[in-house]
Amino acid sequence: MRKKVLIIDDEVDLCKLMKNYFLRKNYEVYTEHTLSAGMNRLEEVLPDFLFIDYNLPDGLGWDKLPEIYTKLPNAHFHLISAFRPRLPVNIEGPKLTIWEKPISLKALDQFF
């Protein structure tokens, strides 16, 4: 079974770039551009890897992490931001990676 990736980011070009990257590596990939759409898709997809932006048009993605973390305890979380804000409480560990924009494909290759 293919691993699933959900990317929640309002930058359409970044989502396209990352989607193409993961499709070439044979992942099942989903993208959403708002927090509410991303949360709905999360329930449907149950991703193995979640990329979520800090600042989305309808809220702060990282604020939802404690809720998401309880729903998907086995998922790997990849937090995206143009700057490095503080981490949400109780969300640290080996399944958490912070990506500062711009994200390079070379950097992704080191993880996937």
Q: Where are the predicted features?
A:
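Two-component/phosphorelay signaling modules centered on CheY-like receiver
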Residues: 12-30
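Hydrophobic/aromatic residues positioned on beta-strands within the core alpha/beta folds
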Residues: 80-81
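C-terminal output helix
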Residues: 103-112
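Acidic catalytic/metal-coordinating carboxylates
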Residues: 34, 60-63
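Active-site residues of response regulator receiver
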Residues: 53
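Acidic, metal-coordinating helix/loop segments flanking the phosphotransfer/catalytic sites
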Residues: 31-49
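Short amphipathic alpha-helix used as the core "switch/output" element in two-component signaling
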Residues: 62-74
